Amino acid sequence: VNITSFNFDKSKVHSILKDKQGNIWLGFFQKGVMIVPPVINNFKYMGYKSSTHNTIGSCCIMSVCKDHSGSYWIGTDNDGIYRIAPDGKQQAHFEQRPGIGHSVSSTIMSICEDSDRNLWIGSYRDGLARLNPQTGHCEYIYLPDKDQKPVQSIYSIIEDKHRQLWVGAMGAGLYRINLDTKEIYRCPSTANGFEYRPLSNILHNSWINCLLCSTNDKLYIGTYDGLGCLDIPTMDFVSTYEINRLLQGDVIYALYEDLHHNIWVGTSQGLKQLNPQTQKVREYTISDGLPSNSISAIEGDANGNLWISTNFGISRFNPGTQTFVNFYASDGLQGNEFSKGVSFASTQGEIIFGSTSGITYFNPGEITSPNKNPEIR
């Protein structure tokens, strides 16, 4: 194990011990003890804690995407957007330039590459834009709110199989853009709640965090107050009273559809499994093995496992055995706190999670379960 790759003050190490399990114990002057396990998982990292050259600054990561060429697009809080080559080298850094109307916004909340390889970005203050990946020039798209004022905060962007771009805004609801005709539609919103008005064009909450297009042509909408479900062919919101009753009040940060078409919902109060056929919801919390009830993002691997980032580590969940395996900084992560809603799974199977200190990315097949806790007497 190369212990120098870990983030600690090497000048403060006063003693070193290797135990029977292969763990290396480091004793620090007035700083306590650090344990380095014998097998470090192949969690890769980009960020300011890197022992090599930092390519993405020191700001919190707010969005991430991997494009058709394999380049990483990383949106930050107050430092624009970075383009990183597959080998980890910085290709571009586009940041806000005061007085220049077509420069990128400072805080990028969402990134999406559409089927035409256009790159769309949603910002915290400047709304929706289409980004030229070579020049950084932004074409801002006017999205009107109910008062015809431009929408500012875009937290989620996704394309469906009908070549429609869905845009989730904070406080302004849901928008649909036809990529062929360029027409823009706004889905109405009301406080009455779609669960009380089946098959009506109503969304329960206009503060949208995340979106998911399912295989059965439904758009799931995670909001600050529960879950919405839109039938895309008919453009009607589907009433699911029991689901709304169980999820209403939850802040939803993440949505994922598994290989069996269950919808997994990451909330501020734990992980929820939704079966669209039975309309049943199952809940998982710390008492079931999660490292934290505050779920940040959810992705899946080819074996049907879920990978869940939280505000206290990453968890691998096997739905078949109903077991969680948790990973922390001591298992090779560069930190335990991950950003809300920031994740991406590439077509090659790589999973990426954004955090407060950079991005963690890995191939699930290269990650092994951590050793048992070392014996302390």
Where are the regions that the model predicts?
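Carboxylate-rich, polar loop motifs that coordinate divalent cations or form catalytic acidic clusters
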Residues: V1-R377
